[in-house]
A protein has these predicted regions:
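Hydrophobic/aromatic residues within transmembrane alpha-helices
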Residues: 57, 70, 122-123, 182
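Glycine- (often His-adjacent) and acidic-residue-rich active-site loop
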Residues: 59-95, 143-145
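Short, flexible helix-coil linker/hinge segments at the edges of structured domains or between repeats
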Residues: 84-88, 130-162
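A glycine- and small-aliphatic-rich helix-loop capping segment at beta-alpha/alpha-beta transitions
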Residues: 69-79, 125-132, 153, 159
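Amphipathic alpha-helical blocks and their helix-capping loop/short-beta junctions
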Residues: 184-246
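Glycine-rich beta-to-alpha active-site loop
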Residues: 100-144, 169, 179, 190
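Conserved CoA-thioester-binding segment of acyl-CoA-metabolizing enzymes
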Residues: 1-58, 98, 244
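Contiguous mid-protein beta-loop-alpha structural module that forms a pocket-lining wall or clamp
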Residues: 151-206
Length: 246
């Protein structure tokens, strides 16, 4: 299974790995309806294909994994009176997020560079969230008056090192998580030395062997570790008025 090289998502099967490569670098891989459709169809096909043992999602560009949903597409659609079409865009995106969260096979997201908004939607719900030292993440939607979506308002409270207060902090502030922060709260499951080498071993040896070979330790303490007590004290309240007063 392959797609043409000008597709916004390159789809292939390498050995026993279904590979999704986000291929819209000029737009920092922001997700549009075509990309969501391609990813969804590939995942549906591989789910019941015994020859595919695992799924990899990555980017062709080292600058960005994915900068989020295509906000310009949605804005232009609303202004053009295409409300139902834009509603369908979000329905399809959220359905894809749910599919990833419940996927029965290892779903390995390799995150290098920018990971924002919808980029977390196609990565943070998977079984393996593998980052490099160049990765950083945020949910910046509050800055444009939008909710923390793509399931992250739920997931960010439940990552192994997170809490409801930490999830509220991440969503309400749009805080930019470093690679150390991503490991601290459990958004990332593994930190690796090199994305390219890891991917080659993932395809050739399987995810567990590749992680054994390439996982490294975090080199510096996460900022969130030092702020954790203050975040819990401030963002554990149930309303913005109470948070602001704290």
């Amino acid at each position: 299974m392959t797609t043409q090289t000008d597709s916004p998502v390159l789809v292939s099967v390498r050995h026993h790995t279904g590979v999704l490569e986000l291929n819209r670098p000029r737009a920092l891989n922001s997700l549009n309806p075509e990309m969501i459709g391609i990813i969804t169809r590939a995942l549906e096909q591989w789910r019941d294909d015994d020859s595919v043992a695992q799924v990899l999602i990555t980017s062709v560009s080292p600058k960005a994994f994915c900068s989020g949903g295509d906000v310009r597409h949605v804005r232009d659609g609303i202004l053009a009176g295409k409300e139902e079409e834009m509603d369908r865009f979000f329905t399809d995106e959220y359905s894809m997020n749910h599919m990833i969260a419940s996927y029965p096979k290892p779903y390995v997201a390799v995150l290098d560079g920018i990971v924002m908004g919808g980029g977390l939607g196609v990565s943070a719900h998977g079984s393996h969230r593998v980052i490099t030292e160049r990765a950083w993440a945020s949910m910046p939607e509050m800055a444009i008056g939008y909710i923390t979506d793509v399931g992250i308002s739920y997931a960010s409270q439940r990552w192994p090192g997170s809490s409801p207060a930490m999830g509220a902090f991440i969503g309400l502030t749009g805080y930019r998580l470093t690679e150390a922060d991503m490991m601290e709260v459990g958004l990332a499951t593994h930190l690796i030395d090199d994305a390219g080498d890891f991917i080659e071993d993932l395809v050739g040896l399987g995810v567990d062997n590749a992680l054994d070979e390439h996982t490294i330790e975090v080199k510096e303490e996460a900022r969130l570790a030092g702020w954790r007590d203050d975040i819990e004290a401030t963002f554990s309240h149930g309303s913005w008025a109470d948070i602001d007063a704290a």
